[in-house]
UniProtKB/Swiss-Prot annotation:
Taxonomic lineage of the native organism: Bacteria, Pseudomonadati, Pseudomonadota, Alphaproteobacteria, Hyphomicrobiales
Protein known as: UPF0335 protein BMEI0289
An MF annotation (GO) of this entry: DNA binding
A family per Pfam: GapR_DNA-bd
Family, similarity comment: Belongs to the UPF0335 family.
Length: 92
């Protein structure tokens, strides 16, 4: 082997080491975030249990939260379609 091959092998090895380190860092970040997501999910469940214990309907609250995430025009369009379908089925 000549010196060019040795240098090339060293660069390749170093690049692989860096890539493995980056991959490991990404995976560890994702794992930490997944754990945080689980913790937040557990916290949200506790809040729903508290509101249910206070006499509120958790299903209705979930609907309100879903609707609040939408733009006004999206929500109004959805409500209009719902009303149209209910009228068509004689449900209003």
């Amino acid at each position: 082997m000549n010196w060019r091959n040795l240098v090339s092998d060293d660069i390749t090895s170093e690049a692989q080491t860096i890539a493995v380190g980056q991959l490991r860092a990404f995976i560890e970040r994702i794992e930490r975030l997944e754990e945080e997501k689980k913790t937040i999910g557990d916290d949200i469940k506790e809040v729903y249990a508290e509101l249910k214990g206070s006499g509120f309907d958790s299903k209705v609250v979930r609907t309100i939260i879903r609707l609040r995430k939408k733009e006004d025009h999206e929500r109004q369009e959805e409500e209009a379609m719902l009303q149209l379908y209910m009228d068509a089925l004689g449900m209003s």
